[in-house]
């Protein structure tokens, strides 16, 4: 249950962080700049970057496994 609460809090923080530019309150309030010190553009590009890294690593591992299994069949 504790893990679920932490995940919900992180998701809520991320959603608020990514919606700040829509309501134009990113730099207007000092409390907001303390809670969200990094620009909201990072909130958009971070998942894209992580997905690219994940797909690259997954593809690399699958490629190595396919090459190794093909070499074993030939021997």
Swiss-Prot record:
Pfam families noted in UniProt: DPM2
Disulfide bonds: none
Transmembrane segments: 5-25, 42-62
Alphabetical GO biological process terms: dolichol phosphate mannose biosynthetic process
Compartments it resides in: Membrane
Keywords attached to this entry: Membrane, Transmembrane, Transmembrane helix
Annotated protein name in UniProt: Uncharacterized protein YIL102C-A
GO cellular component, one term: endoplasmic reticulum membrane
Species assigned in the record: Saccharomyces cerevisiae (strain ATCC 204508 / S288c)
Lipid bilayer topology: Multi-pass membrane protein
Main location: membrane
UniProt GO molecular function: enzyme regulator activity
């Amino acid at each position: 249950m504790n893990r679920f609460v932490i995940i919900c809090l992180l998701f809520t923080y991320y959603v608020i962080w990514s919606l700040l530019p829509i309501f134009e309150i990113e730099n207007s309030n000092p409390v907001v700049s303390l809670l969200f010190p990094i620009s909201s553009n990072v909130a958009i590009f971070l998942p894209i970057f992580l997905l690219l890294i994940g797909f690259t690593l997954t593809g690399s591992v699958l490629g190595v496994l396919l090459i190794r299994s093909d070499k074993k069949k030939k021997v």
